[in-house]
């Protein structure tokens, strides 16, 4: 299942950039990172978190826009080393990354896009992603359960099928 990714958050200290990796199967945010600099280190940090959550990812696909941070040699090499295929949106077509774009739109609607400080933004993002979104947010595409519950249910079904 593809992992789409990315927004820009404003603070008096300057911009803060957020890279997010969403598992399209469950809508679970498996990796994320923030930084005052949008570069390959930001997306590599998010990828590292995703791999810690999911382990080696043979057969998985990573989908992003065509930003230089995603096109960097370091990022492409990290994907290859992890068994992940790289997919990039067509130039100028935001619909190719619709899940990610929708996620960021919801985030900005619910949290806003201006924060008092980088520290406040990071704290609120942690709470939003790890506590609210992954654990509590119900999704119509998941039969109105949270990403965490959807994954638990899927694992239970798989376990029962393997035992049969």
Residue ranges with predicted function:
Residues 1-164:
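Charged DNA-binding/catalytic regions of mobile-element recombinases
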